[in-house]
Amino acid sequence: MLDWVIEGATVVDGTGAEPFTADVGVQDGRIAELGRITTAARQRTAAPGAWLTPGFVDIHTHYDGQASWDETFSPSIHHGVTTVLMGNCGVGFAPNVPGREAELIALMEGVEDIPGAALAEGVKFNWQSFGQYMDVLDAMPHSIDFAVQVPHDPLRMAVMGSRALAQEAASPEDIAAMRTLLRDALQAGAAGFSTGRSDNHRTARGQETPASEASAAELTGLASAFQGLGHGVLQVVSDFDLLRSAERFNPEFDLVEAMARASGKKLSMTWLQRDPGGEQWKAIQARVEAAVAAGLPLYLQAASRGIGVINGLDASFHPFMGFPGYKEVARLPLAQRAAALRDPARKARILAEKSERISGDGTPVQVSVPFAVHFQTFDGPTDFLADRRDGEYWFLKVYEPDIDLPWWVTFGLLLLGIGLPVLALPVV
């Protein structure tokens, strides 16, 4: 007798074959039968019209803190994900040196926009070594499977302390100490190692991430910790010095290849198109294809959708944040800020101003992409387009929708009318 039969579902089996209708029988937690099932079962579920798929494996997540208090890995569990890989982009919470917890929180808050207050409340930091961190997670119940990578930034901070935050070059002794900690973590069960080299990644305090300028000697020295082990993967996120000089692309990519060679393991790297990057993604693809042809196991991580951020007056980012007229009231409680922004004189002033170039903590950065915004916070709905003009960031009032129509109708017409793709824009 089977434990469970799911009847008449549309099955996507993960092989690349076309979807098909079938029954699926489960016994002892594993698929036992597939097809038209007449075997008796303790439970039968009619599922016509439902899709039945293998569980998804999400290889790029940042549950490093949440995993220590949330057994569900929400929201991934709600989207069919059954395995997650954490510790990406070189940020995480282990190894940890007591007294430096706030620095790790500021790092994750700044890079991944995870609220620092939630991390400070939820992450207990009842570990020091990476092995102890894994033991803490392993002792908790979890609804889905997970694996963890050793992030470069905490590793560097554990060995170099304040020198890591100052981005000092690692000495041979520093590299040897980091390599030992990494090797110990891999032998304890860590899935891999990650590093981040993006100019857009900053801590919540506006600092560059500790390992973003790590030398070739440091990167290859750490990668060599994988030698002789039967498992492991390296993960790299890099913008290849996009905001500095196009001539830096190849030297930066050379570092990625050097890490793969030194490790003898597979290397997975983020593959994104960034504005103002032109067609950098094609250059990345060409270098990867050449490396693979030469025998290096490089793999690309491609996002299945456009990546944006949450914007709002009570969020980390919103289009008003750089305008002097807003910054005067930025520290007021939300209700008082909203009231101040309803003042016609302040509204007119903000719309006439140009924004400073800012990041989350107020440091100058280059604005990445134009975006459109829909607001219901003033006297009726208003749509805006934010864009660069002459190297500066402008916030333009471009349309007041017909209030007799649903806002998404007039907003969509607005975007189409100015030649912007509706689905490619983050909308608030």
Explain the meaning of each model-derived region:
Residues L52-P75:
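Di-metal (Zn2+ and/or Mg2+/Mn2+) metal-binding site signature of metallo-dependent hydrolases
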Residues T53-H60, M86-N88, V237, T270:
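Active-site neighborhood of phospho(di)ester-bond hydrolases with catalytic His/Asp-centered motifs
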Residues W69-G192, L229:
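Divalent-metal coordination cores built from histidine and acidic residues
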Residues G391-V428:
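Targeting-peptide/extracellular-domain and disordered-appendage signature
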